[in-house]
Amino acid sequence: MKMLDNIGLVLEGGGMRGMFSAGVFEAFMQADIEFPYATAVSAGACNVVSYLSRQPMRTRKIITDYVSDPRYCSVRNLLRDGSLFNFDFILKEIPQKLLPFDYDAFRQSSCNLYVGATDCNTGEVIWFPKETMGEDFEPLRASSSLPFLAPVVHFQGHELMDGGLADPIPVEKAIADGFERNVIVLTRNPGYYSTENYPIWLLKLWYAKYPKLIEIIRTRSENYNRQLALAEQLEKDGKAVVIRPLEPLTIGRLYRKPQELLKLHDHGIECGLALIENIRRLAQK
């Protein structure tokens, strides 16, 4: 693969909308390019690992074979385990038994991956390097644990939740780590701005123990829109290539109909391939 020196890869989350990002990674593999650095949260982190392990169409096969399986996502899981998504099934049984993940290739990848999760006590993002993953992918579990739909994850002395709360589009992390030029993969169309918000009474009821977490959830839309504006400005300044869906998506975070998800994956491949030459030009600056 052709290493794009000094170009970072920045990945937002988005739940099942992350199938768009997975398609973009397929385009990168088809174009035979790789990045020395990636920073990712939530679904972006979960999907990029198959790109780093060089396993084409692996994420697509997960969708065709398992996304409709109640073990993957169901109210039963939520009632039984407190998590809508069964992360033991997703992060252990699938990669270790059902659809083997190439852990050795992942570990040997030249890409320095950092996965972000939100510290519930401080409201700040904690970054976990690729070397901390292990075969249980605990940082991925933490980064993908959505408010109200998953329990707090305890890892390395931290109480953690969805990385997209504290750092939804982690381009500032990439810049701080020395990558002034970045490819930024989003899961929302041009013109989208976040207006999400949770009732404050519900946050205080559910997360009374974590006032800093409540504050970061309450201000997430403002933070998202600020980071989105930064990404778009970097693109205008010739310091970034932004890849995102061309039209508004009807697919939400929890969408589970395979055919529509596969169409989104195809769209990601299409959008990724369309911008490969732009990415190569960015690397030559």
Across the structure, where does each feature detected by a protein language model lie?
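Patatin-like phospholipase
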Residues: 1-41, 49-285
